[in-house]
Amino acid sequence: SRLLLKTHDFRQIAAIAEKGDITRVNLQIGDICNRPLPDLPVHATASLFGKADSNASQEDIAKGIIYMVLQTIGGAAVLSALNGPIRDFVLIGNLTKFPQCHEVFPNMEKIYGVRFHIPPYAEYRTAIGAALAYLSKH
């Protein structure tokens, strides 16, 4: 984000991304196939930044960066549990404050048959966990 948007302030990136259109930067299944594939809707991402060009707006790029990060996290979580029974994932940390979480993760839930949970105060859960770990050792 620092190179493309000249900022690394996640609040500013989120605000810029609110006006972005992900279909202007990400190649979607519907762009390469005229009908849904089995278990793969036309709005699913085929290629992150696959449609980005010099005409992409700052807002579209910001949204693309956020989607790339969130889809990578979600995809890694799903892949890590592929051969096991885990189907529920709890998301914590500052990234859960991105409004795009409520776009990206529900779509991934439908595609992969999993559930992503964002608990209250998710942005503080990492610090709470560290404090509890410290207290349990001392």
Q: What residues fall within each predicted segment?
A:
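Glycine-rich phosphate-binding/hydrolytic loop that grips phosphoryl groups
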Residues: 1-2, 116-138
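Glycine-rich phosphate-binding loop plus the immediately following alpha-helix
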Residues: 1-25
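Conserved, helical-rich catalytic subdomain that frames metal- and/or nucleotide-binding sites
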Residues: 18-38
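Adenine-nucleotide phosphate-binding core of ATP-dependent small-molecule kinases
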Residues: 38-88, 123
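Acidic-glycine-rich active-site phosphate/pyrophosphate-binding loop
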Residues: 43-53, 99-112
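Catalytic cores of soluble, metal-dependent hydrolases
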Residues: 66, 72, 91-95, 106-112, ...
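Glycine-rich phosphate-binding loops at beta-strand->alpha-helix junctions
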Residues: 79-108, 122-123
